[in-house]
A protein has these predicted regions:
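Intrinsic-disorder/low-complexity, polar/charged segments enriched in Ser/Thr/Lys/Arg/Asp/Glu/Gln
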Residues: 99-103, 146, 160-162, 176, ...
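Hydrophobic beta-strand-centered segment that forms part of the acyl-chain substrate-binding groove
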Residues: 3-16, 129-162, 195
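Short solvent-exposed loop/turn micro-motifs enriched in small/polar/acidic residues
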Residues: 85-88, 142, 160, 172-174
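Conserved positions in beta-strands of structured domains
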Residues: 95, 150-152, 164-168, 182
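HotDog/MaoC-like acyl-thioester-processing domains
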Residues: 2-70, 155-157, 168-203
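Active-site helix/loop of acyl-thioester processing domains in fatty-acid/polyketide metabolism
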Residues: 97-101, 118-141
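Long amphipathic N-terminal alpha/beta scaffold segment
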Residues: 49-117
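Hydrophobic residues in beta-strands and at strand termini
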Residues: 106-108, 151, 197
Length: 203
């Protein structure tokens, strides 16, 4: 894997995450992803719902004293983990990455289900994540100015999908990127985006 992402993507993989967190952090995120799946698919009786809710409330209270700033948080900064260790993101895994192109794979699960297919908003999130990190390869921070997604077919839940993205051109502070999502040989969605580098002092 070749990866040299900027402020959104973080430091190069070889340098390691800014704050890797506790050794068991990957296990925590994996358990959270599994919980999302179980809750999505479950229709438990009232007593089980009550017990589960109370358990989750206790876990939230356990973690609350350890809240840190965005810059210090572990979730979202672990480039070595699927989806950067951010449970909101589909757990994509990078196969190839450089300044001009990315190849990644993702398996969308029931948590990301719309109606008999992947939720369209999830695909927007996935494209914004991958295209945004590609546009942020380098020292400058860029933000999404425009993102257009075309739904070319049904994106299924379950199969291993292929996601490719590339930088089409750069004009000053503007970076134009595009991406394609495939289920085997079938194009299920594509996207084009514009990301603009921030000026000094811009948040």
């Amino acid at each position: 894997v070749t990866e040299t992402a900027g402020d959104i993507g973080g430091p190069p993989l070889a340098a390691g995450p800014r704050n890797p967190g506790a050794p068991e952090f990957p296990r925590l995120i994996q358990a959270l992803r599994l919980l999302q799946e179980r809750v999505t698919a479950a229709d438990p009786p009232s007593d089980v719902v009550t017990e589960a809710a109370e358990t989750l409330e206790k876990l939230s209270a356990t973690l609350e004293p350890f809240s840190v700033s965005e810059a210090e948080q572990v979730a979202g900064h672990r480039l070595d983990l699927p989806g950067r260790g951010q449970a909101l993101l589909p757990p994509y895994e990078v196969a190839e990455w450089d300044e001009h192109h990315v190849l990644a794979h993702v398996r969308l699960t029931r948590f990301y289900l719309g109606r008999n297919a992947a939720h369209g908003g999830v695909l927007c999130l996935l494209f914004d994540e991958i295209l945004g990190r590609l546009a942020n390869t380098g020292p400058s921070l860029a933000r999404t100015a425009y993102l257009h997604v075309n739904y070319r077919g049904v994106t299924p839940i379950g199969p291993r999908l292929r996601l490719e993205a590339s930088v089409d051109r750069v004009e000053g502070r503007k970076c134009f990127v595009s991406g394609r999502l495939h289920d085997g040989d079938t194009l299920t969605a594509d996207a084009e985006g514009l990301f603009v580098s921030l000026l000094p002092g811009q948040p």
